Amino acid sequence: MEITANAIQTVNENANILFTDTVVCGNCSIMHRDGSGLVTLRGLTNQCRARFRVSFGGNIAIPTGGTVGPISLAIAVNGEPVATTTMISTPAAVEEYQNVSSAIFLDIPKGCCSQISVRNISD
């Protein structure tokens, strides 16, 4: 599945990035509602687990009127940011865009579900 959000968003601290468009639909193991920041991964498999590769890439900046400082994002599983996916960018000025990306493999046990998101974890 590929989901995108091409319009500029202001994402508050501890809030999720919202994905507005489903470019490529997944299968019944991946569920997303356009406009939501949550994606549900379901362990629909005949094996003991279903493995998913989750990746994120995006351009980030400090909005006009903001204070220059580090911006931190992370892929979150069930609302908890995964430390190894932390993406940090420190623009020199407001409205200076920089690119960040991260990826993670997730194992979802058979019959279980997990929700993933990309969260602003800046202080």
Task: Pin down the residues of each PLM region.
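Terminal beta-strand-rich extracellular "head" domains
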Residues: 57-115, 119-123
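Terminal (often C-terminal
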Residues: 1-53, 59-66
